[in-house]
Structure formats: structure tokens, C-alpha cells
A protein has these predicted regions:
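Metzincin-family zinc-dependent endopeptidase catalytic domain
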Residues: 21-141
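Hydrophobic side chains in beta-strands
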Residues: 2, 61, 149-152
């Protein structure tokens, strides 16, 4: 069994489209939707997610992430760093993904559906980052299947609305993480 940590740091978000700031109750909804997306993506594999911060594999949700590879101030949706044999850690940007969920929301989407979309976007970004952490030598990013967890960008409506599935990485995960039946 692999134990992995996933948790939210204190975050906030405000949008005119939403009619103001998200509430503490909505943050809890977002976290629950994100965790559901995360556990659902790894169903059948011997991996267990908790909010422990001291585990070998961990991804946290932070207010924002900056791309440290460039000198100008620019945000990124997520990042991770892994060392084969030692695990790794990643981060997911709440403000980047929440803003994108609002931007990709279909016309007429109500507040509750956008709040759920924020949770899905965050959970799906965490799924992608955990794939990088669990398979540090594998080429995870894919440009061919926009409906997969492996897709290289969170700048797409599918990240927040609709269903995602595993593509070519699922068999690699099965090799790395035994299934629950084994």
C-alpha cells in the first residue's frame, strides 16, 4: 500500500462571475470534490490518500504558484518534483485553477456548478501531479488526448467540465502500484 498526502493550505477566491468571494462551506465542497476526483482516478490501485504532510508522496493545494524558471511574474497551475526511489512533492494553484474554472464555465452555469468545477479542476491537476511523482521517469504529459488526466495543460474546459479518463499512463501505474486484488 502506498500512502500519499493531499491537503489544502488556507485559500481564498473572489470572482464577479460568482458574485463575490467563495465561502468556507464552498471551500469544504471544493476540497471534497477534489478528493473524490483524486481517489476515483486511482480506484483499484493500492494507494491511499490522507491529509498527512509527512508522506513520501504528497501534493498540497496552495493559493498560487509562480513559475520560478522565468524572471517575470507568471503563474502556473501545478508543479511537482520527484526523485526516483525517494518520492516527491507537488503543489496545485488554487487561484489559477479557480480562475480557469470560472473562465471555462458554460454560459448560464450557476454558482454551485462552478464551485464543483473548481474542485474537479483541482483534483484532476492533483491526479496529474501524483502521476509525475509516482512515475518520475515516465513521460506523463500528452498532447494527443484532451480528455485524459495525462493531457499537458489545465487550460481546457475538459479539466473542469465533463469526464476525464486515463490514457497510456494507467498501465504504467498498474506496474508501479499493485492492484487491490493482488
Amino acid at each position: 500500500m502506498i500512502d500519499a498526502g493531499f491537503w489544502f493550505e488556507p485559500v481564498e477566491f473572489e470572482s464577479r462571475t460568482l458574485g463575490g468571494a467563495i465561502t468556507a462551506e464552498e471551500i469544504h465542497t471544493i476540497a471534497a470534490v477534489a478528493r473524490s476526483e483524486l481517489t476515483g482516478a486511482f480506484t483499484g490501485l493500492n494507494i491511499r490518500f490522507s491529509n498527512r504532510r509527512d508522506l513520501t508522496y504528497r501534493v498540497r493545494v496552495v493559493q498560487e504558484l509562480r513559475d520560478m524558471r522565468v524572471r517575470w511574474k507568471t503563474g502556473v497551475p501545478a508543479e511537482s518534483r520527484a526523485v526516483p526511489g525517494f518520492g516527491g512533492q507537488g503543489s496545485v494553484s488554487f487561484s489559477w485553477l479557480a480562475s480557469a474554472a470560472v473562465a471555462y464555465a458554460p454560459d448560464g452555469a450557476d454558482r454551485a456548478s462552478i464551485v464543483d468545477a473548481i474542485g474537479r479542476g483541482i483534483g484532476r491537476a492533483a491526479v496529474h501531479e501524483f502521476a509525475h511523482l509516482l512515475l518520475p521517469r515516465a513521460n506523463i504529459d500528452d498532447a494527443s488526448d484532451i480528455n485524459s488526466y495525462e493531457y499537458r495543460s489545465a487550460a481546457r474546459s475538459e479539466q473542469y467540465f465533463g469526464e476525464l479518463r486515463w490514457g497510456r499512463v494507467r498501465p504504467l501505474l498498474r506496474e508501479r502500484i499493485p492492484t487491490c486484488a493482488e
